[in-house]
Amino acid sequence: MPNSRNYTRRRVLSVAIATAASPASVLSLDAGGLSDRRIVAESRFDVTSAPLQAEVVQLVVDFPPGAWTSWHTHGGQAINLVLEGEITLRHAGMEHPHRAGQAWTDSSGEVHAAGNTGRGKARLLTNFLLPPGCTQTTAVQESPFEPAIAYEVRFPLSALPAETEIAQQVADLASGWRAQRASVGFTANIVIAGEVTYQIGGERKVYQAGEAWSAPAGTLVGEENRSAGTARVFTTCLLPRGTGR
């Protein structure tokens, strides 16, 4: 059975220290045309100490111009994907700008902060992978103008293989889109705009923006946009290294 949760809010956002991104593979579908499903952004990284990970977190965070996180550390690996605008990462006296479509990851405890130095809104998608008992965020110095967490969901993880990758993908689903697939690895999915109907195993439900589900590897998932408008989904998959989605 899928796990389904609405978002909760937290005051402090963690953002990780930068490394280069690598592209994620395209989701394999058995119905619908490619024009009906548009990949907006994606990333793929190795998971650090995969067998130790006990929880996955999905965050959708909005940065108004001038908003910055606290200076902070985090207790597990963070994977970050800029969806809109530009996010600047500060650490060790350096600044690293990341534009829409760029991603980075880190599992270090180094103190850092991230913010929006541009004129328009920025949106950041973050995954945390947390071992048992680890704190998601530890603030060192508070920010006077924090970004806003739009959505946050978390799901427990079963034991992962030592060689595991995490793939993030944001896709727009046109009205009338319909597809079915079997999940290759553990999958967590949150609707971030519009609504999508999912058939997950034996359960069928309409998911609104901010609602999420997870399913283990091998679960048959049906996906359908029955609304009049385009829907947007943020999907995280934990995959054996080298496999497609």
Residue ranges of model-derived segments:
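N-terminal secretory signal peptides and thylakoid transit peptides that target proteins
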Residues: P2-A20
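Histidine-centered metal-chelating micro-motifs
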Residues: W68-S70, T88, W104, S108-G115, ...
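Glycine- and acidic-residue-biased ligand/ion/polar-headgroup-sensing regions
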Residues: G75-A92, V184-G201
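Short acidic-glycine-tyrosine-enriched beta hairpin
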Residues: A92-G109, G202-G218
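Ligand-binding loop in jelly-roll beta-barrel domains
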Residues: G109-T135, G218-G244
